[in-house]
């Protein structure tokens, strides 16, 4: 089970949601990655919190340019993702 979201994570997720609903439809689909950079950002903030989640999101957005091939780039597993072997 993931920890509850911090106020900072909630604010950043709300800002990403505003982007997804108001700005992204005007720009059209152009993200080179799966999941999209905004979806990646939300998942990273939920999984890692505001500091590491923001860092991962910034790194991802900086990779989203025409010279990068894109493709599948999921959020890394978080500290609360456990697997039984």
Swiss-Prot record:
InterPro entries: Membr_insert_effic_factor_YidD
Record key words, sorted: Cell inner membrane, Cell membrane, Membrane
Topology in the lipid bilayer: Peripheral membrane protein
A GO cellular component annotation in the UniProt record: plasma membrane
Top-level taxon: Bacteria
A Pfam cross-reference name: YidD
Keyword Membrane on entry: yes
Known function: Could be involved in insertion of integral membrane proteins into the membrane.
Alphabetical list of HAMAP family matching this protein: UPF0161_YidD
Family affiliation: Belongs to the UPF0161 family.
This protein's name: Putative membrane protein insertion efficiency factor
């Amino acid at each position: 089970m993931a920890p509850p979201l911090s106020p900072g994570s909630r604010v950043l997720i709300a800002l990403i949601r505003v982007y997804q609903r108001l700005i992204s439809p005007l720009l059209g689909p152009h993200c080179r990655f799966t999941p999209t950079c905004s979806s990646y950002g939300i998942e990273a903030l939920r999984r890692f919190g505001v500091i590491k989640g923001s860092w991962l999101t910034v790194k991802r957005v900086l990779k989203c340019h025409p010279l990068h091939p894109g493709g599948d780039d999921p959020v890394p597993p978080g500290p609360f993702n456990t697997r039984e072997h």
